[in-house]
From Swiss-Prot:
Positions with a binding annotation for substrate: N55, G56, G57, E68, N97, D98, S123, T124, S125, S128, Q175
HAMAP family: GmhA
The protein, known as: Phosphoheptose isomerase
Species of the source: Bradyrhizobium sp. (strain ORS 278)
Highest taxon above the source species: Bacteria
Residue ranges constituting the SIS domain according to the UniProt record: 40-198
Amino acid sequence: MTDALDSLISNHLARSRAAMERAAVDGALLASAERIATAIIGALRGGHKLLIVGNGGSAADAQHIAAEIVGRYKQERPAFAAIALTTDTSALTAIGNDYGFDHVFARQVEGLGASGDVLLAISTSGRSPSILNALRKARERGLVTIGFTGTNGLGMGELCDELLVAPSDDTPLIQQIHLATAHGICETIEAALMQDAR
């Protein structure tokens, strides 16, 4: 590989490290993450579920987070209720075809969400219509609404009970911060609910 290509990888890793270091000392992000963990813990303790939505890379993050909650993060324990609304291709394509892509998540929230559940909506831009519509529908149905976004997505906060803002406007870095923070939230949820089981 040429030096120029090698430097692209090195530069990305350096930017990634710097972004993670900023996130690790970002008081607002850390406080928001703690409140989000507390909200999800409360919902799961009450027999409710976590619904998660996102597009593209954020859809992959939604599935990853749901897998950590339903399967396990680190500890052997009972399964907890989490559903990524990004995985049912029949529902996604039927809703997209009949109602438009902007409603692929809102329609699922309407059918699957109940008061006391939590919707985690991930959008690096904070402007995705399908995500914003899901948040609106969740509010109508009495769900707790949580958003993950970047510094350009603050408008999304109007629809969220809690908004976690990655300190970046670079999509790949935002996604990396989201997933790393989500892992910390999953670890917190698991530890708290495991204490309940003892």
